[in-house]
Amino acid sequence: MEIKNIYLGAWFQRTSLHLKEFYYFLETGESKLPLEKEKLSYLHRELEVKNFSWQEREFFDRVWAKFDNLEMSFDEDGLILFKKEYQDLKTDCELLKEFYEERLSPVINYIYSLGAPLPKELAKLELILPYIIEVYQSDRKEVEKLFNQFGDSIQSVAESPEASLYFGQKFFLFNLKGEGIQIEPIVEILIFFREFSAQLNGYLQAHRTIWEKISQIRSQEVLRFKDFTSIRNSLMEVKQTLSFVEARLSQMEKFIAVRRTWSQNLENTLKLLSIYQFDTLANSQNYMTSLWKMTKDYADSTFNLLTILYQENIQREVDALKLVTIISLVISFSRLTEPLFSLNFIGSVLLVFVFAGIFYFGMRFWFRSRKFELR
């Protein structure tokens, strides 16, 4: 068995604008955004890029970069692929993981740190990053032995005339039967499928969390007015998350359509290797879009209901204040027959304002202690 290369990949939704920002950083160690120059310079030094280039392609422009022991490609739709020539599998995997987590991720997180933040419901999403091994002329026993050395096992196998694909928990292994197949485009699609699926799963879990949060509000028989502010703030966070996911799902629809067109020549190979998922993921994306629209409608109706109740209560406070003011003025005018600075006049005015204040704040306390029925 000849082990050729080890791959690791990720996919984060990006655009050509983001790709140009990353290329500018590689080129200058700077950013056109208002970021700390010292930190940018430090991150650039830590990255230790040896060579890089901008590659214009038919579907996706790409930034290619070479580092000490590996190379990386970064496509404009956000797909990142790391490739390392095999030396020692354990060391190679650790090096790829260390580079991704300790050197590249801080760069990506910082140069794209401005703008809409990732909602807290999505902040804990863990990306699925299997190691992908490229080998030549291997058999099942050799693959089983290799997997067992690292505490993994073969879950399934798919065959095509050009290659066999072994699926494990930690590793995917491509056993190439000759030189007639380009492995990197298939690896890219495999990573795209897994990351796309992982994001949809994350959005599904976030939907469940948000729906439960809204349901807990709606399931209460009564709501206290004094709780409206905290509930409103919570719903505002929910609406922010809904807007974020709505935009992401719309982008995902476009990304998967372009990737499908890009991989047309690979369709038969992908199907034979049991990794063709364009139809399945497109259907899942459409379902998730409908699910989040329903969640958005649920959140909007709850928010609008609370807004109506809140405005009604505030209006009652305003009406009470108007009533107190009118009564105070009427009583004050009725005492104008008294000398302006006489003790009787001053005492009457003070008494009116004291009773008016007691009446108003009593009404205000009552309004703010109200409970509203939601059923």
Locations of regions flagged by a protein language model:
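N-terminal pre-transmembrane cytosolic regions of membrane proteins
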Residues: 1-123, 366-368
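Hydrophobic, Leu/Ile/Phe/Ala-enriched alpha-helical segments that form helix-helix packing faces
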Residues: 11, 44-47, 51-53, 59, ...
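Generic detector of short, locally flexible boundary/turn motifs and exposed helical patches
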Residues: 35-49, 136-142, 260-262, 295-296
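Short linear motifs at secondary-structure transitions and domain/linker junctions
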Residues: 47-48, 54-60, 140-141, 147-152, ...
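Extended alpha-helical interaction modules
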Residues: 64-233
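Membrane-associated alpha-helical segments
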Residues: 231-334
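Alpha-helical transmembrane anchor segments
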Residues: 315-375
